[in-house]
Design a protein with these regions (language model features):
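Structural signature of outer-membrane beta-barrel domains
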Residues: 25-27, 35-41, 80-84, 109-111, ...
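Short loop/turn motifs that connect adjacent beta-strands in outer-membrane beta-barrel proteins
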Residues: 27-30, 83-99, 113-117, 133-140, ...
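Predominantly the C-terminal beta-signal and adjacent terminal strand-loop region
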Residues: 52, 104, 243-274
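Residues that define the transmembrane beta-barrel architecture of outer-membrane proteins
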Residues: 12-16, 67-73, 117-123, 190-198, ...
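Residues on the lipid-exposed face of transmembrane beta-strands in outer-membrane beta-barrel proteins
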Residues: 16-24, 34, 73-81, 125-129, ...
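Outer-membrane beta-barrel translocator domains and adjoining extracellular loop/strand segments
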Residues: 2, 42-49, 87-92, 114-121, ...
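Single conserved hydrophobic/aromatic residue that forms the stacking wall/gate
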Residues: 1-5, 9
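C-terminal outer-membrane beta-barrel translocator/porin domains of Gram-negative envelope proteins
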Residues: 6-7, 103-204
């Protein structure tokens, strides 16, 4: 049998996410919520039997639907030991810590709730940290892994941390801590991943002898990122960037399974952040 018009990736996704976060004690946050999705095929699915093959049994055919509904309660625990802060009136302003920030994000899809059609579990761990070395020199690193487990019927890989838009908190730019050249299809192609990111920031790395032409550059950055998942072992990204009062820019080179992957550039404005 060959799949006809219905490609499971060509679906409209109607979704609703809700989460409420409470700080239990200084540096310890717990968030509770849920997510609901209704994914409908852009075109209805059909199977076309080719050759002398018999029609698949009903229990096999029932696994393929035009509409998939999921409902999943979610809990997120985030901890930053030794977090410094100050109070601005009644508002608490978090500053920094000499220890990393740890987070665990767990979600469980429940079959039958609001007509949901499948079960799954998603768990992700994330660690991120900034090490201040003085004289505007900083090291940033981030490490994380995640997996979908205990899935029943077809499910959709939709990680919370492993996303192009899930930026680390407190870093001096919006480039480090995520992948910049990685093809978007990889974010939803595997049920597990392990990744790491490293950034070194300093005022003078490569441009120290060009100060006449680069006096507006505040700092330079070296980026190194790595990712491991099935069929991509490993993915590597190396980049170089500069930061000014107004913008940040970075250039990246990638490698997939030890072969050249591509070259990319990221440009962000920082006009209202500095």
């Amino acid at each position: 049998a060959s799949r006809g018009l219905g490609d499971v990736y060509k679906r409209q996704d109607l979704y609703f996410n809700f989460r409420h976060t409470v700080e239990i004690v200084n540096g310890l946050d717990i968030g509770l919520g849920f997510s609901a999705h209704k994914r409908t095929a852009v075109e209805p699915s059909r199977f076309v039997i080719t050759g002398d093959y018999p029609m698949p049994p009903p229990e096999f055919m029932d696994k393929f639907k035009n509409t998939y509904i999921s409902f999943a309660p979610r809990i997120r625990i985030e901890s930053t030991p030794g977090l410094y802060y100050y109070m601005n009136g009644k508002r608490k302003i978090n500053l920094h810590s000499i220890y990393p920030t740890f987070s665990v994000d767990y979600e469980r899809g429940i079959k039958g709730v609001f007509k949901s059609t499948g079960e799954y579990e998603r768990i992700e761990f994330d660690l991120q940290h900034q090490i201040r070395m003085g004289l505007m020199r900083n090291i940033y690193y981030r490490f994380g892994f995640g997996a979908f487990t205990n899935q029943d019927e077809l499910y959709f890989v939709d990680f919370a941390n492993f996303s192009r838009h899930n930026l680390p908190v407190g870093w001096n730019d919006e480039i480090g801590g995520v992948f910049q050249v990685l093809d978007s299809r990889w974010y939803n192609s595997s049920r597990r991943y392990v990744r790491g990111h490293f950034t070194y920031e300093a005022p003078f790395l490569i441009l120290r002898h060009l100060m006449k032409y680069t006096r507006y550059v505040q700092n330079e950055r070296i980026y190194i990122s790595a990712l491991s998942m099935p069929h991509l072992q490993p993915y590597l990204e190396v980049g170089y960037g500069i930061g000014t009062h107004i913008f940040d820019v970075g250039v990246f080179v990638s490698s997939e399974n030890w072969k050249f992957g591509g070259i990319g550039c990221k440009f962000t404005f920082e006009l209202f952040n500095r």
